[in-house]
Amino acid sequence: MDKKVTEVVEAFAQPIVEELNLELVDVEYVKEGQDWFLRVFIDSEKGVDIEECGAVSERLSEALDKEDPIPHLYFLDVSSPGAERPLKKEKDFQQAVGKQVAIKTYEPIDGEKMFEGKLLSYDGTTITLLLTIKTRKKEIQIPMDKVANARLAVTF
């Protein structure tokens, strides 16, 4: 059900976001406690401001209210994905090459399911990370079909 809702919302949101020269990063539909939340994440090369989030929220809310494709009452939240932006699309991974990323896998690779390191390359099927373990550096390859979650990682 949740996946279907996100796909429907993406279809509504994509033209609105494109019209405003923005990028649709992700859509989440989750239940927290008794409430449903529809979260729409937008971005652009220059980032997004509150006015852009408000414009998308207003237009998307009107479109969703008109068609009413979601069976529950929900809270709509349009925002930037933040510094730890999720990596979902091929373009996201390509743009993240050379940056710090955090990867979670469905099953262990070399005994681990969580990896954080520099994304060295992405070829569409495999991610190559450079991990720093204490003072040693280690390269690891992770097949995309094993990736459960990927995001940019902020390091201090």
From Swiss-Prot:
The keyword DNA damage does not apply. Coiled coil: none annotated. InterPro entries: Ribosome_maturation_RimP, RimP_C, RimP_C_sf, RimP_N, RimP_N_sf. The keyword Membrane does not apply. Required for maturation of 30S ribosomal subunits. PANTHER family: RIBOSOME MATURATION FACTOR RIMP. This is Ribosome maturation factor RimP. It comes from Bacillus cereus (strain G9842).
